[in-house]
Amino acid sequence: MRLPSPLLFRTRPKPRIVIPRAQAASTTVPIVFYGGADPVSIGLVPSFSRPGGNLTGVANFNAELAAKRLELLHELVPTATIVAGLVNPTSPVLAEAETRDLQAAARTLGLTLHVLHACTEQEIDTAFTTLDQLRAGGLVIGADPYFNSRSEQLAVLTLRYAIPAIYQFREFVLSGGLGSIGATVADTYRPLGVFAGRILKGEKPADLPVQQATKVELLLNLKTAKALGITVPLPLSGRADELIE
């Protein structure tokens, strides 16, 4: 089973942090993971309070906000009947969960949804060419860690192709993206270092409860909205945690 975004903390032969691609990477080496999916539902740990084994970490549930992102997109662009989701096929657990939630939300909202795949810069470029051909009126970008590193590229492409897009982290909005809903980066990543430090001091991952990101923020870029010809409803702007002008 591939993990959405884990960190493996290895104490021998010397401390180092690497990115494992599967839970089977080790059953003894302490692993600190970070992921957007529910670690219990995907079988990563038996419970939040008692993770057991050699695993602990942080769950931000950003993958489970995919439907909320589509709802936000629909609220901003109610005339768009064709929309798309962009997921990373190399993270199948995350991609499948987001695809399932987006499809359910699209049915509820009466939208036609196309799910596109990308895991390289070139594939992202190709995806936007496809979006243009599909005449998609909006895009929800998946909560995969790879897309975090491509926030600027994604924001530039959404403006170039004039496609309203919603993502998980504020960095996308600060780079020119239209909006974001998700856990804050600080709330998500800071505990990872804390866990690593505690494990280095001798504590066992099995005894460290999995933490859940507690703060979800909504950001909107009003400058981008204006460039895309979108009028942000006052109730929506009032709900936003931050407006970029």
Where are these regions (language model features)?
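Short hydrophobic alpha-helices and adjacent helix-cap/hinge residues
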Residues: 1-245
